[in-house]
Amino acid sequence: MKDLKGTKTLENLLTAFAGESQARNKYTYYASKAKKEGYVQISNIFLETAANEKEHAELWFKLAHGIGTTEENLLDAAEGENYEWTDMYKEMATTAREEGFPEIAAQMEGVAAIEKEHEERYRKLAANIKEGKVFEREEKVLWQCSNCGHQLVAEKAPQLCPV
């Protein structure tokens, strides 16, 4: 495919991705509210539509951005989290405080602290992949099978669950 960089089409893809992503989240919130109010069928329709919107968002994201290896994706995610906690939420909190919304500013600062933890976690996971340490540790740790729950204390996770 032709390079999209600098095109209105790329801008449109990113706008479509953002819109579909926001719609998906909004519909899941609406589904929760409908279910709490006793409207299970309406809740299910919101959830079904949210799943559709997720697929639409993925289509636009793949065209606009692509999906790399897990290590590349972790580093990309870390960069996004870094921007959120170092720039975005800091600036938004400042604006909220200046406009007389200290409670919103405090919430944004609280979320910024969480985003910093997200960045650190993603960078550590990427380093584990790079160093070949995803399934091994320097000391014994608890490994648990994600299928059956079998637990093993060892330095390395087993290739296959012994159960």
Residue ranges of each PLM-predicted region?
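Non-heme di-metal
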Residues: 1-163
